[in-house]
Amino acid sequence: MSQMENMAVPAVGNMSKEELLELKKAMNAKALAKRRTRTALRVTANVVFAVLILLPLLYAISIALMPSSELFTTELNLFPKNPTFSNFINAFRTVPLLRFILNSFIMAGCITIGQIITCSLAAFAFSFLEFKGKGILFMVVMATMMVPGEATIISNYLTVSGWGMLDTYQVLIVPYLTSAMGIFLFRQFYMTFPISLYESAKLDGCSNLKFIVMILLPLTKSAIGAMAVYTFINAWNMYMWPLLVTGSNNMRTVQIGISMLDSVDSQSITLMIAGVVMIIIPSISIFIIGQKQLIRGMFSGAVKG
């Protein structure tokens, strides 16, 4: 035994150094066993909760692959005995689902890009510029978050109808090109930067737009990622507004297409579930890809600001 070990473990009472070392090893082994037990219980609980959360999705995929003759029986069929992709094929044949998916991608993509641009510009003004009534104006913008969309949907419809914008991409995109939530998110992130950063850039002859594009946006990638994921998923899942302002299949979105799959025949449920499985793939993929950015962006401004 080295001199360091002799100094680190002195004899206590009637116990020798060797007995103390054995006691220390036993205590460490016991603590390690407890830690491993807690970890195993935690992992088991997480797996159980994950299975419970994924169970509806897994059962939906099972129904989508199940012939209607297997679904409507007295037996409880959790898994298809004869898996088939006919439900997916029939879903595309019943309604122009590809067109609906394209429309939803165009709408969600344009809304996402538009909100990132407008919200970042507004947040810059609220964070770095000084003007009369800035605090009151920001409170008014935040107050709009308390107004449900259903309360203004009729007035918005009358407005776009008077402008002749019905059944166009503009009517799907323009009303959602900005949001109070996005302004708040970017402002909280911008508030983490010192005002001296903006003042130094102005002294170097940097314009406001150049300061946003060249300095702010590269430093707020996590906020942009969080905003992009949040906005895209919300736009992809919109139902009431597209249903109200579109009338032709050329402008319908996927959420309306799913409701069109619900007919009176016995295959309607399997067709509808097959359509649901197809349209949730993009939103789930976007969420999985941008999950880290979403969490980081949502919490960074809250913690630092």
Label each residue range with its predicted role.
Residues 38-305:
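A structural signal for multi-pass alpha-helical bundles of membrane permease subunits
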Residues 1-39, 71-93:
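Membrane-topology segments of multi-pass transport proteins
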